[in-house]
Amino acid sequence: MKYTSYILALQLCVLLGFSGSYGQGPFFKEIENLKEYFNASNPDVAEGGPLFIEILKNWKEESDRKIIQSQIVSFYFKLFENFKDNQVIQRSVDIIKQDMFQKFLNGSSEKLEDFKKLIQISVDDMQIQRKAINELIKVMNDLSPKSNLIKRKRSQNLFRGRRASM
């Protein structure tokens, strides 16, 4: 009985090992390359706790997580932009960016361009600040769930009206 437990445990480890290596995607090796380049596995990296992991644990609902994930992805795109001229890690950065693009933006190049535009907006520019304040009411209304509900009901009523007239 004791040997059976060991054999089952060994099989489980082998299965988990294989599924882990195949399920990681092409970015896994590239992340390991970046970790090595930045010496990110050094124990001093853990000082002060994690940057994102604890925050992500606090956000359970999918829609809420998307909000936090967008900020995290924005951070990584800015970080990668700082290393765009570094030939040593460029391939790794490009592969990771492409995979992140596929996962977060579903491969939509329009969404990527909009996302990049938002990242590039400078909050120090007075003209940008003025434009942002001018658009604040529209942005706040767009954030309001009530306005989305009204739009949805209006759209449903239009659709029902068309169906009734057919």
Swiss-Prot record:
Pfam families documented for this protein: IFN-gamma
Keywords attached to this entry: Antiviral defense, Cytokine, Glycoprotein, Growth regulation, Pyrrolidone carboxylic acid, Secreted, Signal
Origin superkingdom: Eukaryota
UniProt KW Signal keyword: yes
Residues bearing attached sugar chains per UniProt: N39, N106
Single GO molecular function: type II interferon receptor binding
InterPro entries referenced in this protein's UniProt entry, alphabetically: 4_helix_cytokine-like_core (IPR009079), Interferon_gamma (IPR002069)
Tissues showing expression: Released primarily from activated T lymphocytes.
Assembly and oligomerization: Homodimer. Interacts with IFNGR1 (via extracellular domain); this interaction promotes IFNGR1 dimerization.
Family: Belongs to the type II (or gamma) interferon family.
Role noted for this protein: Type II interferon produced by immune cells such as T-cells and NK cells that plays crucial roles in antimicrobial, antiviral, and antitumor responses by activating effector immune cells and enhancing antigen presentation. Primarily signals through the JAK-STAT pathway after interaction with its receptor IFNGR1 to affect gene regulation. Upon IFNG binding, IFNGR1 intracellular domain opens out to allow association of downstream signaling components JAK2, JAK1 and STAT1, leading to STAT1 activation, nuclear translocation and transcription of IFNG-regulated genes.
Protein name as annotated: Interferon gamma
Gene: IFNG
